Amino acid sequence: MSAQAGAAQANEDESHKYWGKAEQQFKHKPASQFFDPCQEFADRSIKCMRRNAGDRDMCTDYFQAYRDCKKAWMTQRKEASR
């Protein structure tokens, strides 16, 4: 049992080491680089594909909504960076 506890501690230490390297970068990046506001549209289109056995023709509205969202988001990001 103590060998498992030691392995768990080693895994935890290793994950903290990797997070420590990324933490500073994560905290100093704009939120948009870690959050996709169009993720809900992407999830809905995937659910539609699963519901319709992969028939893309049944999900065109979902795909278009995702493309419109992504286009608006990219336009907004470009304007914000000016």
From Swiss-Prot:
Chief location bin: mitochondrion
Record-annotated disulphide pairs: 38-69, 48-59
GO biological process: mitochondrial respiratory chain complex assembly
Organelle transit peptide: 1-13
Keywords, in A-Z order: Disulfide bond, Mitochondrion, Transit peptide
Compartments where found: Mitochondrion intermembrane space
Motif Cx9C motif 2: chain residues: 59-69
SUPFAM superfamilies: Cysteine alpha-hairpin motif
PROSITE patterns xrefs: CHCH
Placement of sequence motif Cx9C motif 1: 38-48
Cellular component annotations (GO), alphabetically ordered: mitochondrial intermembrane space
Domain CHCH per the UniProt entry, residue ranges: 35-77
Homology family: Belongs to the COX23 family.
Function, as annotated: Required for the assembly of cytochrome c oxidase.
Protein name per the record: Cytochrome c oxidase-assembly factor COX23, mitochondrial
Gene that encodes the chain: COX23
